[in-house]
């Protein structure tokens, strides 16, 4: 009996408050200049790879572009911090094309709409806290 009580206490102590909490992020992307290609959206839960290394993302989504806006929903996310990065893959090659000195050739955007002239946004600048419920964000595409 005593060991059962200890096991229950250990479980309660080791489980974070709201341990099963999950949330969602709804991303509205606007400012797309045309409906060519797709919008490639990546959700990151840590700095490495952010914003342009899609394989390093926690989750990814490829959205068909119909009209001037794209809506993407990431669901059942454990509570924590995330950042969203996207690019308009106009030529459909599934690559974020860049030119000389790494200057983007395709439209892009990140959460919190961070844009720098000389460097890519940092994860810490684009971070979004997520807990239970729905977090709605808007990303404006920059060309």
Residue ranges and their predicted role:
Residues 23-31, 41, 139:
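A short, amphipathic beta-strand motif
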Residues 71-76:
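Exposed aromatic-hydrophobic patches
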Residues 66, 78-79:
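Surface-exposed loops/turns
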Residues 14-17:
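N-terminal signal peptide c-region/cleavage motif recognized by signal peptidases
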Residues 80-86:
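A short tyrosine-centered beta-strand micro-motif
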Residues 107-143:
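Extracellular beta-sheet/turn segments enriched in Thr/Pro/Gly and aliphatic residues
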Residues 90-98:
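Acidic, glycine-anchored loop motifs typical of Ca2+
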Residues 40-44, 85:
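Beta-strand signatures of extracellular beta-sandwich domains
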């Amino acid at each position: 009996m005593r060991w059962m009580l200890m096991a229950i206490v250990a479980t309660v102590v080791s489980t974070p408050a709201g341990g099963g909490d999950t949330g969602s992020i709804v991303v509205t992307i606007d400012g797309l200049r045309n409906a060519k290609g797709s919008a490639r959206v990546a959700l990151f839960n840590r700095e490495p790879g952010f914003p342009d290394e899609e394989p390093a993302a926690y989750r990814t989504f490829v959205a068909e572009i119909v009209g001037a806006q794209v809506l993407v929903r990431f669901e059942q996310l454990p509570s924590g911090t995330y950042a969203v990065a996207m690019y308009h893959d106009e030529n459909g090659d599934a690559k974020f094309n860049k030119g000389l000195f790494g200057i983007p050739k395709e439209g892009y955007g990140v959460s919190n709409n961070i844009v720098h002239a000389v460097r890519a946004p940092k994860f810490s600048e684009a971070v979004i806290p997520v807990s239970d419920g729905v977090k709605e964000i808007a990303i404006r595409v920059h060309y």
